[in-house]
A protein has these predicted regions:
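Short amphipathic alpha-helices and their capping/turn segments at secondary-structure boundaries
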Residues: 46-54, 110-129, 168-181
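Solvent-exposed loop/turn segments at secondary-structure junctions
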Residues: 66-69, 101-108, 135-140, 190-195, ...
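Hydrophobic single-pass membrane-targeting/anchoring helices
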Residues: 1-25
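Catalytic His-Asp segment of secreted/periplasmic serine-dependent ester chemistry enzymes
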Residues: 189-276
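A structural motif corresponding to the C-terminal end of an alpha-helix
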Residues: 165-184, 216-233
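Structural recognition of the beta-strand scaffold that forms the well-ordered cores
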Residues: 59-64, 68, 96-101, 127-132, ...
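Serine-esterase "nucleophile elbow" of acetyl-processing enzymes
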Residues: 26-103, 120
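Conserved SGNH/GDSL esterase-like catalytic core that processes O-acyl groups on lipids
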Residues: 70-164
Length: 276
């Protein structure tokens, strides 16, 4: 919440944008590229159908916000890089990973990014695209004030508006990928706002509303993923448990808003579990 592809640098005029929790982010994008050859001893026996790569390389693209970008996690290996490398190892090919995620991005920003010739070129030759987007679209403070003592129906209008753009993003990514058996993955969120210890410090109303938004959002993302024919990955359960009550503080960076190194490892495992 990224892919033999040549990563084309994309320069976009970005504006500071607050995350759902109201925190501001840097104005720059931080792409990362990892290319490796898998030694015979590290290659899994099975090869993932549809993710065998082409030309001896499996290309992965990451798109989205500060979560896949790796914000607030110093020297982290993001889950985008982990998945891209691991899936290439499974297929006994080289890994080419282009993480085009940008801190602070909203759905509208990704839609603009998808119009860039560089992004279209990158997706055209990618075997796997991983998307995490939507959290920054929610004005959490306003929604908390309005829905603190209401049920889930109070946030549905806010979620519906975001989901329409998420659908368009996924449809455009899928259409842009021309590699045979190319795969699109979209993740949900463990929380669209702050979580763990930091989240609890914001108060019960904040925790109630952000968890409600997250559950409604994730449910709708899963539904449209099924309709469009892309892979949905539940990341809330690995972070917070089946009942949503597990303390995920150790999986988060100090800001309580982004994954820690351990959190990125958990995200990677969740994504890989959904890929054959």
């Amino acid at each position: 919440v990224i892919v033999a592809a040549v990563v084309v640098g994309i320069t976009l005029g970005l504006r500071p944008v607050n995350h759902a929790n109201g925190w501001s982010f840097d104005r720059h994008r931080k792409p990362s590229v990892a290319t490796s050859s898998a030694p015979a001893s590290s290659v899994a026996v099975r090869s993932a159908p549809g993710l065998t790569g082409h030309g001896g390389t499996l290309g992965t693209v990451g798109l989205g916000d500060s979560v896949p970008q790796g914000s607030a996690c110093r020297q982290c290996v993001t889950f985008i890089e982990r998945v891209g490398t691991d899936m290439a190892h499974r297929a006994s090919v080289r890994a080419s990973v282009g993480n085009e995620s940008v801190s602070g991005y909203k759905t509208t920003d990704v839609l603009t990014q998808l119009e860039s010739p560089g992004t279209r070129t990158l997706l055209k030759t990618a075997d796997l695209a991983i998307v995490t987007i939507g959290a920054n679209d929610f004005d959490v403070d306003k929604i908390v004030a309005r829905c603190a003592h209401a049920d889930a129906s109070c946030v549905e209008g806010d979620v519906d508006a975001v989901i329409r753009r998420v659908r368009t993003i996924l449809e455009r990514i899928k259409a842009a990928m021309t590699t045979p058996d190319a795969t699109v993955v979209v993740t949900g969120y463990w929380n669209v706002g702050m979580d763990g210890k930091v989240g609890r410090e914001q108060g019960k109303d904040y925790s109630h509303v952000t968890n409600t938004i997250t559950k409604v959002f994730n449910s709708q993302v899963e539904a449209i993923a099924d309709e469009i024919g892309v892979v949905y990955v539940d990341v809330r359960t690995p972070f917070k448990g089946a009942d949503g009550k597990r303390d995920d503080t150790e999986l988060l960076a100090e800001d309580g808003d982004h994954p820690s190194q351990t959190g990125h490892a958990v995200l990677a495992k969740a994504v890989e579990a959904e890929l054959p």
